[in-house]
Design a protein with these regions (language model features):
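Short, flexible active-site-adjacent loop segments at beta-strand->alpha-helix junctions, enriched
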Residues: 55, 87, 121
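Helix-adjacent hinge/juxtasegments
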Residues: 67-108
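Small-aliphatic-rich amphipathic alpha-helix that forms the alpha element of a beta-alpha
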Residues: 11, 35-36, 81, 96-121
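N-terminal amphipathic, basic helical "cap/leader" segment at the start of enzyme domains
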Residues: 1-80
Length: 121
């Protein structure tokens, strides 16, 4: 348990990147793997990850994530992940009260958090 808390204490939200230093594909794959292993309601896994390392694709996607002048750090970022919430149909056998609940935003947040913790490691 203490290893986990050490990881939580070390994690940071990095905004300073060297655009000339690529991120190793294996590190990106491990982060994505950690994200895919996140818990989700009824194992719905309502997420898709697009790992962007191609400079041309990154140039097309950056403006979509920089609305209101935010996320300017992406201009220097050599790789990033786009997390997409996918629609899921959760079969609820235990209770009808849960059938119209939207758990996907919470599940996606869990998944993205695990991606970030893996990046810290």
């Amino acid at each position: 348990m203490s290893d986990y808390f050490d990881l939580v204490k070390r994690r940071e939200s990095c905004r300073n990147f060297d655009p000339n230093r690529p991120v190793e594909p294996e590190k990106l794959r491990r982060c994505a793997e950690a994200a895919w292993l996140a818990p989700s309601a009824c194992n719905g896994q309502p997420w898709k990850y697009l790992i962007v390392t191609n400079p041309e694709l990154a140039a097309k996607l950056r403006p979509l994530m920089q609305g209101l002048g935010m996320n300017k750090f992406l201009n220097e970022c050599p790789a990033f992940a786009v997390v997409v919430q996918e629609p899921t149909v959760i079969k609820v056998s235990a209770s009808q009260r849960l059938k119209d609940q939207d758990f996907a935003p919470i599940d996606v947040a869990f998944s993205a958090s695990q991606f970030c913790y893996a990046a810290t490691e």
